Amino acid sequence: MRVGDRSRYGVSFFVMCVLVAAWQCFVMALDTQLGGIGNLLHEWHVVAISLANALLLLSPYWLIPRRWRWLVWIPMALLTLWCLMHMCYCRAYDDLMPWRSLSLTDNVNSTLAASTLSLLRWQDLLVALPLVALIVARLLMRGHSEQLSAPAVKPFLLSLAASLLFGAVGYLDGDTNYARRFLHNYGNRSYYARNGLLPYAAFTLHEEFRSQSLTDDQRADLNRFLLEDCPHYTDNVYCKVSHRNLVLLIVESLHTWPIGMTIDGREVTPVLNALVDADHQGVIYAPHVLFQTSHGHSSDAHFIYNTGLLPLRDGVVAVNHGDGPYPTLAGALEGYDCREVICTPGMNWNQTVTARTYGMDTLYTREDLMAAGDFDRHQGFDDAAMTAFASRLLPQLREPFFLEMVTMTMHTPYTPGRVPPSWILKSDTLNAEARGYLSCVHLTDSCIGALLDDLQHLGLAQRTVVAIVSDHTQVYLNRVKGLTDYQATPDDWGIPLIVAGCDTTLRYPSVIGQVDVFPTLLDVMGVNHYGWKGLGYSILRYPVAGAIQPRNMSVIGDSTALTPHQRQAWDYSRLFILDRHNRSY
């Protein structure tokens, strides 16, 4: 190799690599946790932490023989992709991606690709362009000469020393409890911003692969909690007619704020509006449900609604622990014909397995809808195809039945070709994202109306409870209005619970959690003989006024009304999931 070739991987190039890596780590911390690029000049301790981590990450560069130093491009490229991936993920799910999510290859499809591309922003060039500039600089260094003897131990030691120096500037803080700082994780993005890339990687990898079995003390503590702190009532005072059918609609990304909204004088959700009308009897309506999904996203919501448990804060329960057994809504509805219809392939989020775990007798997937020709007849719009499929399925069900349906049309991105045509797209009163989202909401609302019409036409409406819930948030109203997340209220982020066809009429304005839906449905269906009531509270029995979200375990709603049970439920749910094979229901 020529001297000119060797010199291109000398001190100057190493320094440039360190600066690029540190800048990328810093930008990612700004974008995901520290309020964005506007706070660039206020976070010098994070700059020091980023430099310390970049130096430590790249210091092995000096221990590699010169002819192999081109390998430095591998960590540089991977770091660039890693930062971009987490920035996009955080925009969708408000946290960094857990390592196990990288193994969810069954979820990779055109919808995921389109969703990811829609999350890219112009500021992401601040991560990508430095790598491009480094490539250009490397090409321009052909004639530059630096003579270093091998092995380059001295530069390696200097790199470590510089890393320690910058680490001292960034990490040393007289008021910091270092054990708590480095050994406790109250949110991935917060941990990363406070501690940097390498501590974050080490801590989260350790958490991902630590022992998944309970100690005897943990099992005894869990049993005490389940026996003493969980409800055990058996009465059915809120249900006058037993053995009704149940249709559970889990609607993708449905917020409460579009309900009742008009655009250019027309209702966005006429069907849902009619259901929640104040004069409509036999309807429970809770507009301020707090989403409690974690890294499993939609699958976490399915898990909560079907089991009454809370998901893992540090993994994807449907994939890593989807085999059960768990107590389930279908288990409480003993003797029911239990079916599930989804718009996606069964492999997505491990739904082929979880459908059995949740007690479903039959799962119908995207393949079934396509084989029936419903996608072709409805221009590929998922919810319309699913409703058409359900219209033929309903007459075949044995009563009483439990039919769970999971919609998909309202999944991001809201781009041309994926958004159904409507007058909403022509309105100039909202931004493009809101117009696309509301067009999808309008289509799904009409599909719900078609399902209700089918129930009425088949003579099933009077014997059927229809529960409509949402999996998680997507388009906050405060963002549509141009306000910040710090100005968000329950009206901006709330997702709805609507239960129609029951014996109770209730409008519940307080904040509740998704985990409170399970026991509420047990009350509505009159199946409290089932021993498991979930980790939430039925809003027909208890004055729930707040809930805890998993990102940083913050209380949303009235913190003074929160019970010790609600505060402890996340930890005990994790123990329950890990100990599920030692339990029977």
List PLM regions with ranges.
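Transmembrane and membrane-interface helices of multi-pass
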Residues: 2-202
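Intrinsic-disorder-associated interaction segments
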Residues: 4, 19, 211, 215, ...
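Generic structural signal of hydrophobic/aromatic residues within well-ordered alpha-helices
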Residues: 26, 60, 108, 218-222, ...
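Short, structured coil/loop segments at alpha-helix boundaries
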Residues: 61-71, 176-205, 212, 265-270, ...
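A diffuse structural propensity rather than consistent per-protein peaks
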Residues: 88-101, 118-121, 210, 215-218, ...
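Membrane-interface segments at or immediately adjacent to transmembrane helices
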Residues: 167-249
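Solvent-exposed soluble domains appended to multi-pass membrane proteins
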Residues: 223-585
